[in-house]
């Protein structure tokens, strides 16, 4: 019997959200980080994110909702953009991303944002 090592893939969660105001936020599903790299990757590949309709994100620890990344404002599409964690993260803890329409958005148009985050 032959045994081959399996590649370790980091957890990736998709999102497809609509925000009608700057009130409230939405979470992705939780996932484990499968490597020791202290970065996460964000793709925003559809929606109407812009300089007037700003999408805000932050990574949180699922067990206590503690922030493990800085809040980041996004004004355009991104492809596997790399962001560092603000706290040390590990492979035995569940994490999720919380998103919202940023308070500094100047349009009342609903914000639509879709993509994926890799922990």
Briefly describe each language-model feature range:
Residues 1-33:
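N-terminal prepro-regions of secreted/extracellular proteins
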Residues 29-30, 78-88:
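Exposed aromatic-hydrophobic patches
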Residues 39-42, 87-103:
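Noncatalytic modules at the cell exterior or secretory-pathway interfaces
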